[in-house]
Amino acid sequence: MAKGLLVCLFIGLVAADTDAPFNILGQTGYSGEITVNITTKSSLFYWLFQSLTGDIETDTRPLLIWLPGGSGGSISVDLLAERISPLYIDELGNPHFNNMTWALRMHIMGVDFPYGVGYSSPTFWSDWIVDIPTGAQVFITFLNKLQMKYPAWFKREIYIGGQDLAGLFIPAIASLIHKNNGNLTPGQLGYLNLKGLILGDTWVNALQIVNTYDTFAYNQGLANLEQRNVMTTYENYVLGNATSNPHLAFVALQNLLAYVDTIAGPLNFINYRLYNDDNIGNLAAFLNNPVYKLELNVPRAVTWSQVTQSVSTNLTTLYFISQAAVLSTVLNNYKVMIFSSQDNFLINPIAVQQEISNLNWEGISDFESARRSAYTVSGNIVGYVQASSNLTFVQILNTGLIVGLTQALNPRDMIYRFVFNQGWN
């Protein structure tokens, strides 16, 4: 009975598209819920920030579609805390203009994906995303519905990006776009002019990530030799159960991280040099403010949360499903930039480079022999870059996962160099 009442409640919250233009501090775009499943009325929330001096209805500037990272996390954290959008939020929940926004030269769309994240609403239990192919299809359906409503938005180059666990879905989404495009012609409804992917601190192949924690902790002085050996034991247990019993492997992974937190913490796993959480502003106060919810075309009864635990739980079995083969195939047809944050423990630089080295891509040998160069912004070395054919890898120095919070200019410069083919030297 309680489950039936919950289903009725969800249906009552969002039953039709709510999206429309918004204007906050003079920053304009479109936002709201798009009903993806016409039978159950499950919906995804998006907000699209127009390029600061552009008009998405008339120009041809690129569109960057960004997916949330983290397990059950909202896209609003990426857009607002990482300084991707033209807005950021202070500790009182007030919005301010961000002059380092990526929207200076491109349009930015963020999506609360999958269902249940942020403002997005599932209406039936059957709509919860529990596998990657279904998630990719739901996202493509969402894009196709937007394309039907706003065809001009998609008459341009499209890039899809995200960090962390977004790496589980983005290669599958790109692969499905490529497959669908094969049956269509450019300009035809459903054809998406995908040009490239951007993957930050990406969780593509868990087996190449988990087995680095002992080495990374030891090399960074977070563990001594004895503690490193304990971590190795934990890792072997995780990896030994990853395929046969992913639930058990996930529990073991949590125990491994808890052990690291005990010996080296309390540790900020996405920026190990900080011993407290990143200050991302009071997003909940802003996003649950009735005035701003109304402006963003969010149904009044919908409540925003930074992380949705039920979504996180549903995704646990996906952690150990490698997307390396899918990404390898995508690389044959699209350019891909992978970047790594130096101080992210959870998906550390060793892990990201192992993920790359283990790609079964035809160009991997040429990439690994390509020159690695210093990456400079305004004359300062901010990282290193290595590129060959369709693959670019950027190592960003002195930052954790939320790069834009501490280095707002550098990630924008990196994105622009990749999208606009500006070169690195």
Describe the role of every protein-language-model region:
Residues 2-425:
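Terminal and linker regions of secretory-pathway proteins
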